[in-house]
Amino acid sequence: MQPIPIVAIVALVVAIIIAIVVWSIVIIEYRKILRQRKIDRLIDRLIERAEDSGNESEGEISALVEMGVEMGHHAPWDVDDL
């Protein structure tokens, strides 16, 4: 084969691999955003119910615990994951 078609095929394969990697990252980030929205909605419902009734709903707290969300101190300046 001539060198130009070989280079074109290699470039096409590399472009496809890069596209797969980029779209994989996009899908992962999109899932994170959806999960965070769900967590935010649950927290908002908890706050709303706590204001209405004076206590928190156990069902929604257990849903947050199942998702791995820690309740408590939420200080953005207090980062311990370094």
UniProtKB/Swiss-Prot annotation:
Ion channel activity is inhibited by hexamethylene amiloride in vitro. GO terms for biological process: receptor catabolic process; symbiont-mediated suppression of host innate immune response; symbiont-mediated suppression of host type I interferon-mediated signaling pathway; symbiont-mediated-mediated suppression of host tetherin activity; viral release from host cell. Residues 29-82 are cytoplasmic. Pfam families: Vpu. GO terms for molecular function: CD4 receptor binding; monoatomic cation channel activity. It is found in: Host membrane. It is a single-pass type I membrane protein. Its main location: host cell. The modification Phosphoserine is found at S53, S57. Residues 1-7 are extracellular. Keywords: AIDS, Apoptosis, Host membrane, Host-virus interaction, Inhibition of host innate immune response by virus, Inhibition of host tetherin by virus, Ion channel, Ion transport, Membrane, Phosphoprotein, Transmembrane, Transmembrane helix, Transport, Viral immunoevasion. Phosphorylated by host CK2. This phosphorylation is necessary for interaction with human BTRC and degradation of CD4. InterPro entries: Vpu (IPR008187), Vpu_cyt_dom_sf (IPR009032). Enhances virion budding by targeting host CD4 and Tetherin/BST2 to proteasome degradation. Degradation of CD4 prevents any unwanted premature interactions between viral Env and its host receptor CD4 in the endoplasmic reticulum. Degradation of antiretroviral protein Tetherin/BST2 is important for virion budding, as BST2 tethers new viral particles to the host cell membrane. Mechanistically, Vpu bridges either CD4 or BST2 to BTRC, a substrate recognition subunit of the Skp1/Cullin/F-box protein E3 ubiquitin ligase, induces their ubiquitination and subsequent proteasomal degradation. HAMAP family: HIV_VPU. Homopentamer. Interacts with host CD4 and BRTC; these interactions induce proteasomal degradation of CD4. Interacts (via transmembrane region) with host BST2 (via transmembrane region); this interaction leads to the degradation of host BST2. Interacts with host FBXW11. Interacts with host AP1M1; this interaction plays a role in the mistrafficking and subsequent degradation of host BST2. Interacts with host RANBP2; this interaction allows Vpu to down-regulate host BLM sumoylation. Belongs to the HIV-1 VPU protein family. HIV-1 lineages are divided in three main groups, M (for Major), O (for Outlier), and N (for New, or Non-M, Non-O). The vast majority of strains found worldwide belong to the group M. Group O seems to be endemic to and largely confined to Cameroon and neighboring countries in West Central Africa, where these viruses represent a small minority of HIV-1 strains. The group N is represented by a limited number of isolates from Cameroonian persons. The group M is further subdivided in 9 clades or subtypes (A to D, F to H, J and K). The N-terminus and transmembrane domains are required for self-oligomerization and proper virion budding, whereas the cytoplasmic domain is required for CD4 degradation. The cytoplasmic domain is composed of 2 amphipathic alpha helix that form a U-shape. This is Protein Vpu. The gene is vpu.
